[in-house]
Swiss-Prot record:
InterPro entries: Oleosin (IPR000136). Residues 156-176 are annotated as: Disordered. Pfam families: Oleosin. It comes from Arachis hypogaea. Disulfide bonds: none annotated. This is Oleosin Ara h 14.0103. Keywords: Acetylation, Allergen, Lipid droplet, Membrane, Transmembrane, Transmembrane helix. Its main location: other. It is a multi-pass membrane protein. It comes from the Eukaryota.
Length: 176
């Protein structure tokens, strides 16, 4: 059996750190040396972006000003109206409840009417699907029946005219 002294010695390689260093780029800094310029786009903004800014900033500013004025007016109005509401609350509360109930009733009636119309529309569409005919098909059928009836009436009128003519000739022959 082989012992540890019989074996050839093993060589172990040890790697020492090299002088090369991997730099992790930090935010806002480019290793290539471009500095802050690398953060900027290579070309300027497009014409549509410039127009959007020129239109958007004044419009947004105006709307912000109007919303601020609206908020200010609401706060002033609430500050003035609060004592009035407290003073007249025995009258205002029942009036608000009455108006609220009336509006709720009107909206409920409208919703019920709309639901009824939708149900009627659904039933009509369901019946059309059950019968397998649609309005254009029914109109074509009615047109064909009207044309057939017109042909029939025309033929009957022609037959009646010939019969009258035949009888008139018979009367003329018998009287001569």
């Amino acid at each position: 059996m082989a012992t540890a002294t019989d074996r050839a010695p093993h060589q172990v390689q040890v790697h020492t750190p090299t002088t090369q260093r991997v730099d992790v780029p930090r935010r806002g800094y480019d290793v290539s040396g471009g500095g802050i310029k690398t953060l900027l786009p290579e070309r300027g903004p497009s014409t549509s972006q410039i127009i959007a800014v020129l239109v958007g900033v004044p419009t947004g500013g105006t709307l912000l000003l109007l919303s601020g004025l609206s908020l200010l007016g609401t706060i002033i109005g609430l500050a003035i109206a609060t004592p009035v509401f407290i003073f007249f609350s025995p009258v205002i509360v029942p009036a608000v409840v009455t108006i609220g109930l009336a509006v709720t009733g009107i909206l409920t009636a409208g919703a019920c009417g709309l639901t009824g119309l939708m149900s009627l529309s659904w039933m009509i569409n369901f019946i059309r699907q059950v019968h397998g005919t649609t309005v254009p098909d029914q109109l074509d059928s009615v047109k064909r029946r009207m044309a057939d009836m017109a042909d029939y009436v025309g033929q009957k009128t022609k037959d009646a005219g010939q019969e009258i003519q035949t009888k008139a000739q018979d009367v003329k022959r018998s009287s001569s």
